[in-house]
Amino acid sequence: MTRYKAQISYDGSAFSGFQRQPNCRTVQEEIERTLKRLNSGNDVIIHGAGRTDAGVHAYGQVIHFDLPQARDVEKLRFGLDTQCPDDIDIVKVEQVSDDFHCRYDKHIKTYEFLVDIGRPKNPMMRNYATHYPYPVIIELMQEAIKDLVGTHDFTGFTASGTSVENKVRTIFDAKIQFEASKNLLIFTFTGNGFLYKQVRNMVGTLLKIGNGRMPISQIKTILQAKNRDLAGPTAAGNGLYLKEIIYEDKECFSNFRK
């Protein structure tokens, strides 16, 4: 068997998430269906680096899969790309070693979250940015977000009842930008891993800080108390994008860790 790694992007609006599930349209199901056609009707299982939720988008999701023979990677990419549905794009395919695993090999993820703060909201962005109708002071959020950088126990920012025992993660970079022409806030987080709904909970908390309903020090309070009840609401999934995944064998991986 020959193992392939692929970078894919998708519009998550019409998907119930990445991972295959009964009676739902998922990214995994659509790609596996296409691979089956390219593999003479034989099943192919794909593995994803991140399991995005319903409505969540991706520019840089990474998958891997095995095929019984070596193929020209550009022809394979082209075949997959043209036969997958229009809301999935196969950006790049490369052959990798048999022991490569897109989820378990050491990597760094970058997530982006878009918030439309326009009043009125932009209806064209309804599937691609979460609307926040309340006034915010961006400088308050830019100050508060600094407290997320570093190695912390993020229990207070994950979904209640998660089965993951070790909730310590490292965020290498966290920032907020504002595109005034589009009334868009762009939150960017880069780290060695993120807990279930962690990014959406961090954004929900930062928005409450920006609105003045939580103090700038609230991030520190949540990290110390490890209490989800102290954090803000979970921001909607339509504003979330899996932007990039960098593996340890890439030079830029070590640059992030410095």
From Swiss-Prot:
Give its E.C. classification number.
5.4.99.12
Cleaved signal peptide residues: none
Top EC class, one word: isomerase
Q: Which residues form the active site?
A: D53 (nucleophile)
What are the recorded GO MF terms, alphabetically?
RNA binding; tRNA pseudouridine(38-40) synthase activity
Indicate which residues the UniProt annotation says bind substrate. Y111
Q: How does it assemble?
A: Homodimer.
| Protein name (Swiss-Prot/TrEMBL) | tRNA pseudouridine synthase A
The record lists the lineage as: Bacteria, Bacillati, Bacillota, Bacilli, Lactobacillales
Q: Which gene encodes it?
A: truA
